[in-house]
């Protein structure tokens, strides 16, 4: 059982960009110091609330300040990029980090980005992900000439090749055959879980979704594995959750549900933005819950794991028994405005030092039974 940090990130839109970048960098370095195994970062081009357009550029900025933590994109929204650019940039950062890199991919989740890049069709975006990964892996696996023809892109490089000078040759990753690939999952019974099973990719279940939706990802994955004659393995399944650990249950409750708390801001924002685009169902604790009952408090109660170290441990054990054998827990990093910086630092310490060792012991003991 590994521990990682996931950041969309979400910040109030009136905060200065340089300030949130510095804050998220500080949080990332702290995660490395506390022994977090992984750091995953989102990509959004057209929202000052979710202000990171280049996770690999962010990682490059903090790379010299870290020692062990691995870096993952969560995710590169492939419909917004030519696959040759992603292949080259991923190969470069894989070398910069000497293999501490994981390529998370997805079809995108921000409606303004869909409009910006003229990709409104969700089914087309899903096909674009599969085609782009195929092209990326083929670029990594072979030297030119290239003549890759797809539904959405072409990669052609035949004439401008000078082998003795290295001209025409794409960079290859540090890892062989390349960085491990994972795909994001945010809807119940996501078809991307089936894609992950058939392609051998990892899965990243989103932090904003309820328990039943996370469980459905494992069910879809296992069904696809069975159809393909593959043994399902949760080792490469990552589940992101909002986690807040405090010295006592009452303190944790106040920090989660209080008006100053970043979880309150986070779910207020998510509820509003998803409601406006007709996607509130993603957040509903039950599929049949009426919209008017899908309040910020109801979503928070369902999606935030909070309490004392013992309470959070018990909740994580129960959660994993309910959803399936995920191999990595990703704690969601939130905004540090007001008292939240001190609260989240304390939560990170308690999760890493008190909760996770016991959670790992439980998982190992359960696996040995």
Segments predicted by a language model, with ranges:
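N-terminal beta1-alpha1-beta2 module of alpha/beta enzyme domains
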Residues: 1-71, 177-179, 368-369
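N-terminal small/glycine-rich loop or linker at the start of catalytic domains
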Residues: 1-16, 109-110, 162-178, 282-301, ...
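Conserved, mostly hydrophobic/aromatic
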Residues: 3, 35, 43, 62, ...
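Hydrophobic faces of well-ordered beta-strands that scaffold small-molecule active sites
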Residues: 3-7, 39-41, 71-74, 101-105, ...
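Active-site mouth loops of central-metabolism enzymes
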Residues: 7-22, 76-84, 177-188, 246, ...
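Acidic (Asp/Glu)-rich catalytic clusters
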Residues: 32, 59-68, 90, 94-101, ...
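Glycine-rich, proline-tolerant flexible connector loops at the mouths of alpha/beta enzymes
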Residues: 38-62, 77, 109, 208-211, ...
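Internal, glycine-rich beta/alpha segment that forms the wall or movable "lid"
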Residues: 82-199, 215-219, 227-228
